[in-house]
Amino acid sequence: MPITFQCPHCGSQTQVDDRYAGQSGACRSCGATITIPGGPVGAPAYPQRSSSSAAPIVIILIAVVVGGLLIVGILAALLLPAVQAAREAARRSMCVNNAKQIGLALQEYADVYKMFPPAYTVDAAGKRLHSWRVLILPFLENKALFDQIHLDEPWDSENNIQFAGMMPSVFACPSNAAAPGSTTTDYAVVEGPGSIFDGDKPCPLGAIRDGLSNTLLVVEASGANLPWMEPRDLDFTQMQCVVGGAGGNEISSHHPGTATVGFADGSARTLPSGTPPAVVRSLITRNGGEAIPANY
């Protein structure tokens, strides 16, 4: 590309090919030494982005990230209670299923022996030996464990204490955080005169005149701290019959506001904490003739 050049000495203009840019020679008009302006052409210069123009973009990016984190946190806070409630509902359903399995095992025992098992067995001197929970092991698919237990010795004898840590999982409520590996059960019967489980006396099916669907068979007793093999349950004579009541001798639960119970007909459901004590007492008795409200 030609370069227009004016001699600084004589003022004459001329067209010079750009390949001579930066070279010196004699002016065609006056003969004076001249230097053609220009030189190697470099890469075109691009305008540099100033730090002041980049700052708003950085601020916007930070705002977007922080805003996104805030939204995630808010969503998590909103969803967490719903997730926890769903999990608790699932555990409550599993607890009801446990009570149903225990109730069905008791029914199978009754089908074989024509009576429900006693609350506990005793030796010749009347000393308590084993719980009903041990007696129904064969009906809970745990006959191998049952066959190893020395039924003629106390539950905590030298030969038997080794089995205390082998509690079947059906005896633990799913909401009990200490359940895995636990030796204590969350399920009990109400033991005492008037109930299905009156000491060491088995209860014939015909003795339940209030109706199987109106008589409690097994209840949740998470506050009782009961070793599963120990021949001990809730004492009917000492109960206040309050669902969720304080102390270790009441129907109690890991589930807020309810407790799981199983009936003699094999059904199971939850009782609300506000159930009147008179209703609870009526459900415990097997031959009291009480009127049970329809909603219970």
Per-segment meaning from a language model:
Residues 1, 21, 76, 254-258:
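A short, compositionally biased
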Residues 1-51:
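Cys/His-rich metal-coordination motifs, chiefly Zn-binding "fingers/knuckles"
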Residues 8, 17, 81-84, 174:
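Short, proline-centered helix/strand-breaking motifs
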Residues 8, 28, 81, 97-100, ...:
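Surface-exposed alpha-helical interface segments used for non-catalytic interactions
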Residues 28-31, 84, 103, 137:
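Short, surface-exposed helix/turn micro-motifs that flank interaction/cofactor sites
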Residues 52-105, 111, 115:
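Amphipathic alpha-helical segments typified by the pilin-like N-terminal helix
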Residues 91-296:
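Surface-exposed loop/linker segments characteristic of extracytoplasmic
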